[in-house]
From Swiss-Prot:
The keyword Transferase applies. A non-essential component of RNA polymerase (RNAP). The gene is rpoY. Its EC number is 2.7.7.6. RNAP is composed of a core of 2 alpha, a beta and a beta' subunit. The core is associated with a delta subunit, and at least one of epsilon or omega. When a sigma factor is associated with the core the holoenzyme is formed, which can initiate transcription. This is DNA-directed RNA polymerase subunit epsilon. GO terms for cellular component: DNA-directed RNA polymerase complex. InterPro entries: RpoY. One of its GO terms (molecular function) is DNA-directed RNA polymerase activity.
Length: 76
């Protein structure tokens, strides 16, 4: 399952929508909830990012992300 993780680069400042960035993770999980938990844990273990939201991408949404040219899987 591919998850899109929205985050701020630092936990030091209050989140601002203008500074929100995203990364994509391929997570092996039995359910959407388990995938979200694994994604959050993975990001928190490998970065200092402030995770705002984690979204499971549907096939159509994933196709759209690939078409826009911003899609790139992140590996830790």
């Amino acid at each position: 399952m591919i998850y899109k993780v929205f985050y701020q680069e630092t936990k030091e400042r209050s989140p601002r929508r203008e500074n929100t960035q995203a990364l994509y993770l391929d997570i092996d999980a039995a359910s959407e909830l388990e995938g979200r938990i694994k994604a959050r844990k993975m990001v928190e273990e490998h970065t200092d990012y402030n995770v705002e939201f984690i979204e499971l991408l549907s096939d159509k949404h994933l196709d759209y992300e690939k078409e826009t040219g911003v899609f790139e899987l992140t590996e830790f």
